[in-house]
Structure formats: structure tokens, C-alpha cells
Amino acid sequence: MFYTILCVGTGGFVGAILRFLFYFGFAQFFSQKYIFIATICVNIIGSFIIGFVLNIATTYAINYNFKNFLVTGLLGALTTFSTFTYENAVFLNHGEISKFFLNITMSIILCLIFCFLGIYTAKIIH
């Protein structure tokens, strides 16, 4: 059990750093007011990877600790529902209704599409 916890924690450490670097890099190229797009991007990337990995796991034996490292740890820290929720609350609070609906719509639709693409890619590979 301790080793599994260590794997999840290490994955979370890596995922949190990747998310920070992604946001930092995004902020260097775009205005801070568009930082919500970085949240959409990390959630899309995470959706693809989780769809891919968990579909592969239905056919191939993936090490339990590696799966926990990747899915629970890394993807859990990389993707974020709390930031998504906060950004939408800020949009509503500032009366930015179009950004609110755009963010919700893009996040849900694109994340579903990329999750299915991950599943489909995994099926093609095996």
C-alpha cells in the first residue's frame, strides 16, 4: 500500500509541475485574461490520455502502480475541475456571460471528443 501511495504522490508531483509549466508558458505568449484556455488545454490533453490509457488497460495488463501513478497521480494533478469552476464563477461575477458559456461548452465538448479520440487511438494500436 505504501508503494502505491508513493506512486500516486510522485505522479501528482509530476502532474502539478507540468500544469504549472504549461500555465507559465501559456501566460508568456498570451494575455492573462485568456488563461482559461490553458485550463481547457490541460483538460483536453488529460481527457485524451485517460481515454487512451484506460482503454489499453481493458486489453493489456498495465501495472497497478503505474496506472495509479499516471491516472490518479499525474492526470489528477494535471487536469483540474476546481480551476475550471473558479474561472467560470469569475466570468459570471464579472458579467462575462459569453466567456462563461464558451468555456463550459468548449471544455465539455472538446474533452469528450479527445477522450473518445484516446479510446479510438488505443483501439487502433491493438
From Swiss-Prot:
Activity control, per UniProt: Na(+) is not transported, but it plays an essential structural role and its presence is essential for fluoride channel function.
UniProt name for this protein: Fluoride-specific ion channel FluC
Entry's Gene Ontology BP terms: cellular detoxification of fluoride
Cell compartment(s), UniProt: Cell inner membrane
HAMAP family: FluC
Topology versus the membrane: Multi-pass membrane protein
GO cellular component entries: plasma membrane
Catalysed reactions, as listed in the record: fluoride(in) = fluoride(out)
GO molecular function: fluoride channel activity; metal ion binding
Species of the source: Campylobacter hominis (strain ATCC BAA-381 / DSM 21671 / CCUG 45161 / LMG 19568 / NCTC 13146 / CH001A)
Protein family (similarity comment): Belongs to the fluoride channel Fluc/FEX (TC 1.A.43) family.
Keywords (A to Z) from UniProt: Cell inner membrane, Cell membrane, Ion channel, Ion transport, Membrane, Metal-binding, Sodium, Transmembrane, Transmembrane helix, Transport
Function of the molecule: Fluoride-specific ion channel. Important for reducing fluoride concentration in the cell, thus reducing its toxicity.
Transmembrane spans: 5-25, 34-54, 71-91, 100-120
Binding site for Na(+): 76, 79
Pfam families, sorted: CRCB
